């Protein structure tokens, strides 16, 4: 007859993933003639579980290098973009104990410029960006294991004897080099 035990342990009890594409408009001081480059830096975020979702609140800086004055001068304009991504969770565990949990948010795709263009009216810069997150909720859950009544504990002394024999075979002089003068 088998015997079962219930064990409470921590495990990933829910997961979610979200891919986002967004468009941001930047207003430079001077009217742009052409776009020379665009990049995103300084990405920071925090994650919090709210109900059956994880809310990721963060920001990043968009830098756009552009020319103006009929392509005779250049400048870099920077704008901080704030965002909130709400990730729906898929629960994998019906035995999840909702008292305490830990939220782990991982960036699968750092915010990245897809395309940087000049707006149709010619005085703004339009930046298309993308980002992707994976969110996991780690919480306490209950698992049931079968107890093996025939199990015997291994003798640790045998393992220690084998380790002692291996240590005896080591040459203690292998690290010693020629004495320095």
Swiss-Prot record:
Keywords: Sporulation. Residues 1-101 are annotated as: Required for deposition of coat proteins. It is found in: Spore coat. The keyword Cytoplasm does not apply. Residues 176-178 are annotated as: Required for the assembly of CotS and CotSA. Its main location: other. GO terms for molecular function: identical protein binding. Residues 156-158 are annotated as: Required for the assembly of CotA, CotR and YaaH. Residues 102-144 are annotated as: Required for targeting to the spore. Residues 159-169 are annotated as: Required for the assembly of CotG and CotB. It comes from the Bacteria. Belongs to the CotE family. Morphogenic protein required for the assembly of the outer coat of the endospore. Is also a regulatory protein for the expression of cotA, cotB, cotC, cotH and other genes encoding spore outer coat proteins. This is Spore coat protein E. The gene is cotE.
């Amino acid at each position: 007859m088998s015997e079962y035990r219930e064990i409470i342990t921590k495990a990933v009890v829910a997961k979610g993933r979200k891919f986002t594409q967004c468009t941001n408009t930047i207003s430079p001081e001077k009217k742009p003639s052409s776009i020379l480059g665009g990049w995103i830096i300084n990405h920071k975020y925090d994650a919090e579980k709210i109900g059956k979702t994880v809310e990721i609140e963060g920001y990043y800086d968009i830098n756009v290098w552009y020319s103006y004055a009929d392509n005779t001068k250049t400048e870099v304009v920077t704008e901080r973009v704030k965002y909130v991504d709400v990730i729906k969770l898929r629960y994998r565990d019906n035995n999840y104990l909702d008292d305490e949990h830990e939220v782990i948010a991982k960036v699968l795709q750092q915010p990245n410029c897809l395309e940087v263009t000049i707006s149709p009216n010619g005085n703004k810069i339009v930046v298309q960006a993308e980002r992707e997150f994976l969110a996991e909720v780690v919480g306490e859950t209950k698992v049931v294991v079968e107890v093996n009544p025939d199990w015997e504990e291994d003798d640790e002394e045998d393992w220690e004897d084998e380790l002692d024999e291996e240590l005896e075979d080591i040459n203690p002089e292998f690290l010693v080099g020629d004495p320095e003068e």
